[in-house]
């Protein structure tokens, strides 16, 4: 609110009442009284000014207490840090040994599980793959590829790996038991330290929230640098609130004066101003004595005002009346902000006290650790490391063996598919050979018949004229050609096998007959006849393997 209202009232003006025309343009008495009532109501803000004085006093006391307690906490903290750093560095090292070993062991076990699952899957495929009956002697029971595999090596490998895993698990269990015992001894200290850290972090967070420079560490002591600035802010708010209250008092005085200078307003002014507040003190400064000033204003004789002075006073009053509510709101906002700042100051003081109490509690608990078996905990960690290094090599060797076995068995599956494809290829070649033979025989027979007919025609037409001894072969039939199958020997690089007696006894011209769902030729070679679906499945598996090759 401006100070123009105080200059709007002139004590040297002549006593002139407003003319009737002017009275129509000036506000009515009821309007001025409403402004006076509102101005009186705004003076209740003096309670906020009183509260502001209390807040400043409480904040100053909290600052003094915080400084003393913070100094004590800092002294204890310097000794506490070294002891805690040593204690928890040992615990951290032991825990890292356990975590590192557990992580490495878990990784190795995962690799073992993957390799073992892959091997078992391959073995299951061997069990599920039935050897086609055409590959085996007639009358033999059905067999799978797994029947041709000796799993004793797999069982022995599993036994070796299980022994290494059990020994590692036992060493790890001993280390975990040792760490739990260590944790039991540290539990009381951890509880006290947890309270200490919680108090420190809370104090640091409050300090960071009220300060423009955040704390560098959650475990650092709370800074008190923001409290003096907050105290200064409270003092400035209290001073400004007192100034705002003075402006409200001046506005109230102006309203009283305006009502009194309005016809019929004197009695109303005395009735309204009968119970106003008294003096207020702000930071050692005595504020306006509202009651005495108002009584003096009410009881003082009216100074005469000219029409222009009265109009100017009313204009200032109306303008200030529009701003009075804003002034009251500003006082309320400032006292609200002061309450918030005081809460922060007291919270920081309480945080400093809680950190101090937590620090002394940690020191008391540290004394119980004098007989801690630190050497035993460290020795247990070293023992686990030694065992793990020994068994790690053993497990890695077993992992390589599992991979080799899986490669071997997977190669068996692949070779069986190759066998199916090879049989299909041989049957295709056999069919092509037979076709060539049939075509050749047909052509040879045709040539033979043509030759016989031609010779007979020649004999009939010319034979009577030729002497029989002119050429002995004139009356002979043409030669005949026959194909004979010869049993194949072993491929190069394969040792010679004794000849198959049954095949040797077979007649050269004997027709092919079915043996064990296959074809046996005059050469004794049996080529199984496989179902088309079986061959197609083998081709699909072969193509799938080729797609997965790098």
UniProtKB/Swiss-Prot annotation:
- The lineage's top-level taxon is Eukaryota
Is the keyword Ion transport in the record? Answer: no
UniProt keyword terms in alphabetical order:
Autophagy, Coiled coil, Cytoplasm, Membrane
Compartments annotated for it: namely: Cytoplasm; Preautophagosomal structure membrane
Coiled coil, from the record: 317-350, 427-457
> For this UniProt entry, which segments traverse the membrane?
none
Question: Chief location of this protein?
Answer: cytoplasm
Question: What GO molecular-function term can you cite, just one?
Answer: molecular adaptor activity
> What are its GO cellular component terms?
Atg1/ULK1 kinase complex; phagophore assembly site membrane
Pfam families, alphabetized: ATG17_like (PF04108)
Composition-biased stretches, type Low complexity, lie in: 495-507
InterPro entries, sorted: Atg17 (IPR007240), ATG17-like_dom (IPR045326)
Q: Where is this region: Disordered?
A: 1-25, 204-224, 492-527
Bilayer topology annotation: Peripheral membrane protein
* One Gene Ontology term from the biological process aspect of the record: piecemeal microautophagy of the nucleus
The answer to keyword Cytoplasm applying to this record is yes
Q: What does this protein do?
A: Autophagy-specific protein that functions in response to autophagy-inducing signals as a scaffold to recruit other ATG proteins to organize pre-autophagosomal structure (PAS) formation. Modulates the timing and magnitude of the autophagy response, such as the size of the sequestering vesicles. Plays particularly a role in pexophagy and nucleophagy.
Family indicated by similarity: Belongs to the ATG17 family.
**Which PANTHER family does the record associate with it?**
AUTOPHAGY-RELATED PROTEIN 17
What's the protein name? Autophagy-related protein 17
């Amino acid at each position: 609110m401006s100070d123009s209202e105080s200059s709007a009232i002139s004590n040297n003006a002549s006593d002139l009442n407003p003319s009737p025309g002017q009275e129509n343009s000036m506000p009515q008495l009821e309007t001025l009284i409403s402004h006076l009532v509102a101005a009186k109501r705004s003076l209740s803000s003096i309670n906020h000014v009183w509260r502001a004085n209390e807040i400043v006093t409480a904040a100053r006391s909290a600052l003094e207490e915080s400084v003393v307690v913070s100094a004590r906490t800092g002294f204890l903290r310097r000794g506490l840090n070294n002891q805690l750093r040593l204690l928890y560095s040992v615990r951290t090292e032991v825990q890292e040994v356990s975590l590192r070993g557990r992580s490495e062991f878990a990784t190795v076990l995962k690799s073992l599980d993957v390799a073992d699952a892959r091997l078992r899957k391959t073995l299951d495929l061997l069990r599920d793959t039935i050897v086609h009956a055409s590959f085996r002697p007639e009358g033999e029971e059905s067999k799978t590829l797994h029947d041709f595999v000796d799993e004793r090596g797999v069982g022995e490998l599993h036994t070796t790996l299980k022994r290494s895993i059990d020994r590692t698990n036992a060493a790890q269990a001993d280390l975990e038991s040792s760490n739990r015992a260590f944790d039991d001894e540290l539990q009381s200290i951890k509880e006290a330290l947890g309270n200490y850290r919680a108090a420190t972090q809370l104090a640091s967070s409050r300090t960071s929230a009220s300060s423009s420079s955040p704390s560098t560490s959650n475990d650092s002591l709370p800074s008190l640098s923001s409290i003096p600035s907050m105290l200064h802010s409270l003092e400035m708010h209290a001073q400004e609130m007192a100034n705002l209250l003075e402006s409200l008092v001046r506005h109230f005085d102006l309203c009283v004066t305006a009502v009194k200078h309005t016809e019929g307003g004197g009695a109303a002014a005395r009735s309204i101003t009968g119970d106003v507040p008294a003096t207020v003190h702000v930071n050692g400064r005595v504020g306006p004595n509202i009651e005495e000033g108002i009584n003096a204003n009410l009881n003082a004789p009216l100074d005469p005002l000219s029409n222009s002075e009265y109009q100017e006073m009313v204009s200032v009053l109306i303008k200030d009346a529009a701003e009075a509510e804003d002034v009251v709101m500003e006082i309320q906002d400032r006292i609200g902000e002061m309450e918030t700042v005081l809460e922060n100051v007291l919270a920081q003081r309480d945080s400093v006290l809680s950190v101090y109490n937590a620090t002394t509690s940690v020191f008391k608990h540290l004394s119980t650790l004098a007989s801690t078996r630190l050497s035993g905990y460290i020795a247990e960690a070293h023992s686990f490391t030694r065992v793990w290094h020994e068994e790690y090599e053993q497990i890695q060797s077993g992992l390589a063996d599992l991979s080799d076995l899986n490669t071997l068995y997977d190669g068996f599956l692949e070779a069986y598919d190759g066998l199916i494809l090879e049989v299909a290829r041989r049957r295709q070649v056999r069919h092509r050979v037979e076709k060539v033979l049939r075509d050749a025989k047909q052509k040879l027979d045709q040539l033979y018949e043509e030759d016989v007919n031609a010779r007979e025609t020649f004999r009939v037409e010319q034979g009577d004229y030729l002497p029989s001894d002119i050429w002995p072969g004139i009356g002979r039939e043409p030669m005949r050609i026959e194909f004979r199958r010869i049993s194949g020997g072993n491929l190069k690089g394969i040792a010679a096998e004794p000849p198959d007696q049954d095949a040797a006894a077979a007649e050269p011209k004997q027709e092919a007959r079915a043996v064990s769902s296959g074809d046996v030729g005059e050469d004794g070679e049996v080529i199984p006849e496989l179902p088309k679906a079986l061959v197609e499945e083998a081709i699909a598996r072969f193509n799938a393997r080729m797609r997965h090759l790098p």
